[in-house]
């Protein structure tokens, strides 16, 4: 059974649709960033993971492979806060700054995980800076 010209035109090869390209582009950006960014005990990596609904942040010492502190919008005190996703991201930035200070961390290397530096990512970074972290 052969396909008509119209059916052939509509076929998209596997892995070539828009969502796959977008995801792979993000992965490539993150790999490029990770080649340059590494966390140490004195200056750990501030890793940001963003999904459509939540944002997660970790302080990672790459040499030892340990997470020093973490914060997320899934925590009860952040969920109780009012505001949009950008405001909740700023709250997470304040939380990670407090927890970093408690862990004895003053300066961090920012790893935005292949995401663009705007919106929720920028709000989180600005709040962490206001909380006393040096990027």
Curated annotation (Swiss-Prot):
Record carries keyword RNA-binding: yes
Which region ranges are annotated with the description Disordered?
A: 1-23
State the Gene3D superfamilies in the record.
Answer: 3.30.420.100
What Gene Ontology terms describe what this protein does at the molecular function level? 5S rRNA binding; structural constituent of ribosome
Q: Name one Pfam family in it.
A: Ribosomal_L18p
Q: Which BP terms from GO are recorded?
A: translation
Reply yes or no: does the keyword RNA-binding apply: yes
| HAMAP family, A to Z | Ribosomal_uL18_B
Chain's role:
This is one of the proteins that bind and probably mediate the attachment of the 5S RNA into the large ribosomal subunit, where it forms part of the central protuberance.
Q: Which family does it belong to?
A: Belongs to the universal ribosomal protein uL18 family.
Can you state the subunit structure given in the record?
Part of the 50S ribosomal subunit; part of the 5S rRNA/L5/L18/L25 subcomplex. Contacts the 5S and 23S rRNAs.
Q: What is this protein called?
A: Large ribosomal subunit protein uL18
**Record organism:** Rhodococcus jostii (strain RHA1)
């Amino acid at each position: 059974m052969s396909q008509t010209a119209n059916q052939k035109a509509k076929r998209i090869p596997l892995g070539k649709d828009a969502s796959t390209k977008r995801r792979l582009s993000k992965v490539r950006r993150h790999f490029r960033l990770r080649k340059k960014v590494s966390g140490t005990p004195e200056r750990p990596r501030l890793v940001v993971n963003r999904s459509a609904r939540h944002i997660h942040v970790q302080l990672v010492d790459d040499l030892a492979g340990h997470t020093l502190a973490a914060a997320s919008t899934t925590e009860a005190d952040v969920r109780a806060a009012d505001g949009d996703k950008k405001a909740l991201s700023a709250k997470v930035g304040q939380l990670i700054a407090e927890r970093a200070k408690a862990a004895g961390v003053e300066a961090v290397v920012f790893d935005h995980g292949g995401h663009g530096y705007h919106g929720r990512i920028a709000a989180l970074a600005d709040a962490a800076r206001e909380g006393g972290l040096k990027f």
